[in-house]
Amino acid sequence: MAFFPVSLNLRGRRCVVIGEIDNREAIDKAAALRDSGADVRWIIDPASLRDEDVTDAYFVISTPQDEALSARLRALADQHKFLLCCIDQPKYGFVAMTAIAKAGPVRIAIATSGLAPRVGKILRQRLQAAMDERFTRFVERLGGMKLVMQREKPGPEHAAERRAAMIEAADGFDADVHFTYPSWFDAPRG
């Protein structure tokens, strides 16, 4: 199944996380939603979920691997038009969670369409390590330059000039990417 990658502005929007209090996935998802400015409600006992707990939600993330719960949530999502992610059960949801590498204002989402979550995790860890404090300063300086350009040369008639200046400012930035594969991958099949 192919998903379309997108970033959501969840500031002030009602989001619901379903998962027990010690569920690492639920803890991480609730924290990420709060970091995004969402109004988060956490249902720690999936058995106590009432339909009205999710009907006014914008986005619901369900962490239990419970087919009946996921099917029920899908029916509610279809009826009440909220976004739904059922972790490790993509057939029920509209949203697949990505591995996120972040530094300052930069967010890089990594998706493997559910085929290789470990690969996504490794990519996230390596990118996260590469996006150090110097990288963050560089991006923030570019952002400052962009704001100055927009203030000094506003309007669509200067858009090409602003774009060219930003391309020139980033000239010389590069990322060195290299992949290493396990020994079984290149071994002859037989």
What are these regions (language model features)?
Residues 2-31, 138-153, 158, 190:
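Glycine-rich adenosine-cofactor-binding loop
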Residues 16-17, 39-44, 60:
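Short, hydrophobic beta-strand segments that form beta-sheet elements in well-ordered domains
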Residues 34, 38-52:
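A short, well-structured beta->alpha microelement
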Residues 54-59:
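Short acidic/histidine-rich motifs immediately flanking catalytic phosphotransfer sites
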Residues 63-65:
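Glycine-rich, N-terminal phosphate-binding loop of Rossmann-like dinucleotide-binding domains
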Residues 67-114:
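Rossmann-fold NAD(P)-binding glycine/threonine-rich loop
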Residues 114-190:
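An accessory alpha-helical subdomain
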